[in-house]
Amino acid sequence: MLRGVLGKAFRLAGYTIQYGCIAHCAFEYVGGVVMCSGPSMEPTIQNSDIVFAENLSRHFYGIQRGDIVIAKSPSDPKSNICKRVIGLEGDKILSTSPSDVFKSRSYVPTGHVWLEGDNLQNSTDSRYYGPIPYGLIRGRIFFKIWPFSDFGFLRDSPNGQRFSDD
């Protein structure tokens, strides 16, 4: 009897570990559901919107200008940020201060990206901490799940592209 109980317990533990490994790989390498907080991506993503982030692009297809990404915060590695890719390595970016008074040109070095929020007046982004390493990108957001009234693919940036001509 003890043998049967131990056998079932070990089988259950084995299945639990297997399913846990599968779930971990799915969330780490395929994608998952993310709740975005803060006003920096308004009007595209509102505070507490739930979105789907896929992780395959950063490994296989690459991140493109205009993509919305989840990345580790350069100023607080324990938290994630949700921002739009404005520039890729080698790009020259024309950025403005939050007050729209000062304009500056920035160069994105190799292995880095330039991220900004869609709500430029209320976003802490690459204008403050500079280009971020590509390795900090966790995934690409492309689909809004909640609220149901906004269910669907995300739209382009309301700010347009801001690249320097020289």
From Swiss-Prot:
Top-level class of the enzyme under EC nomenclature: hydrolase
GO CC terms of this entry: mitochondrial inner membrane; mitochondrion
GO molecular function: serine-type endopeptidase activity
EC number(s) recorded for this UniProt protein: 3.4.21.-
Listed Gene3D superfamilies: Umud Fragment, subunit A
InterPro entries: LexA/Signal_pep-like_sf, Mito_IMP1_subunit, Pept_S26A_signal_pept_1, Peptidase_S26
Keywords, alphabetical: Hydrolase, Membrane, Mitochondrion, Mitochondrion inner membrane, Protease
Compartment list: Mitochondrion inner membrane
Enzyme active site: 40, 83
Pfam families (alphabetical): Peptidase_S26 (PF10502)
Location (main, coarse): mitochondrion
GO BP annotations listed: signal peptide processing
Family: Belongs to the peptidase S26 family. IMP1 subfamily.
Function field: Catalyzes the removal of transit peptides required for the targeting of proteins from the mitochondrial matrix, across the inner membrane, into the inter-membrane space. Known to process the nuclear encoded protein DIABLO.
Subunit-structure text: Heterodimer of 2 subunits, IMMPL1 and IMMPL2.
Family matches, as NCBIfam families: sigpep_I_bact (TIGR02227)
Protein name: Mitochondrial inner membrane protease subunit 1
